[in-house]
Amino acid sequence: MKYFFSLPFPKVHTTCKHTAAATASQPLQKIRERLESGPGFQEFVQNPSYNREDWSAYEGKLKREKGEQDRLRLPPWLKTKIPMGKNFSRIKDQLRELKLATVCEEAKCPNIGECWGGGEHGTQTATIMLMGDTCTRGCRFCSVKTARAPPPLDPDEPKKTASAIASWGLDYIVLTSVDRDDLPDGGSNHIAETIREIKRQNPRIFVECLAPDFRGNLDCIRTVATSGLDVYAHNIETVESLTPFVRDRRAEYRQSLKCLASVKEINPNMVTKTSIMLGLGETDEQVEQTMKDLRAVGVDCLTLGQYMQPTKRHLKVIEYVTPEKFKHWETRGNELGFLYTASGPLVRSSYKAGEFFITSILKNRAAAAAEEATATKPSE
């Protein structure tokens, strides 16, 4: 005998295809509405949810422990606006047309939007990088291209640079350069010629130059220091113990100190300037000693800023230093006797915020020199 079992049929829910489509589109529509009413990309970059005067509430991780491989997340105080605007585009187009390199782009400076766009000071500027965009050294923090034999110098660069600067109508300009160890004079004559041409086209402008160490060659340093330059800058970059690890092996801590000391020997009235990066693993005691070493060789102006890893192949950030700690170093710099100390996460050696203070120093010195010359002039 055959037995037949009756099995229950599964329940099937049916809906009209138009109803199903409408139901599926509801969550999508809600997402679209949230995107339209929510913050834009610019707001994510600027991260306005934090009070930029007080970062004490920030709870993110700021320091990598020994052995950790993961990169730290960028804290909110280091997030900047996306560069844009008419001024930014105009200055970029002009530099391209003249085939001039800038440290702003090559070093991926976070302040490019403010400097090229005008920022709070209203005057746009760029830091011209002389002698091309390729360096003979390979510092582990720097994103500038490197090669043993870079292209030859452009003989028209001094005039093109001076013309661009003259068109900007500035009263202060910062020049920098790559290292050119492949040249007998390290490029010192090329730099000096550029400074002279800038002064020829605009005698009233103040010129600051962030110069190489020229392997400690005193003649090269003298060539630049006696070119009509107003501010001679050379960066110490980091503390002594980290120098072999951070900088190219040809760049030595004591050699940099000697360069800065030599400038003062050549011209005691020359304003000298240098910069220190923080966040590479240095201790407070090492930073303090570096500042004392710099004062011992007569350095006038000091800037301290946060090291930021430009690409994955460069040194990782060990620590993101807080704005409060940077403020401490600014106070300490003033106590040690620097004429000017700029210290902050986004401060860079060529950042224009310090130009106004240095300009006043130079103008006051010029006025004092003129007054002294008048006082000592024999009466007829």
Swiss-Prot record:
Cited Pfam families: LIAS_N (PF16881), Radical_SAM (PF04055)
Keyword Transcription: no
Pathway assignment: Protein modification; protein lipoylation via endogenous pathway; protein N(6)-(lipoyl)lysine from octanoyl-[acyl-carrier-protein]: step 2/2
Binding of [4Fe-4S] cluster 1, residues: 104, 109, 115, 350
CDD domains on file: Radical_SAM
Cited SUPFAM superfamilies: Radical SAM enzymes (SSF102114)
Molecular function terms, GO-annotated: 4 iron, 4 sulfur cluster binding; lipoate synthase activity; metal ion binding
Residues noted as binding [4Fe-4S] cluster 2 in the record, renumbered to the chain: 135, 139, 142
One Gene Ontology CC term in the entry: mitochondrion
Co-factor remark: Binds 2 [4Fe-4S] clusters per subunit. One cluster is coordinated with 3 cysteines and an exchangeable S-adenosyl-L-methionine.
Domain spans labelled Radical SAM core: 120-339
Cofactor(s) listed: [4Fe-4S] cluster
Protein localization: Mitochondrion
Extra remark beyond the main annotation: This protein may be expected to contain an N-terminal transit peptide but none has been predicted.
PANTHER family, alphabetized: LIPOYL SYNTHASE, LIPOYL SYNTHASE, MITOCHONDRIAL
Protein name per its UniProtKB record: Lipoyl synthase, mitochondrial
Originating organism: Culex quinquefasciatus (Southern house mosquito)
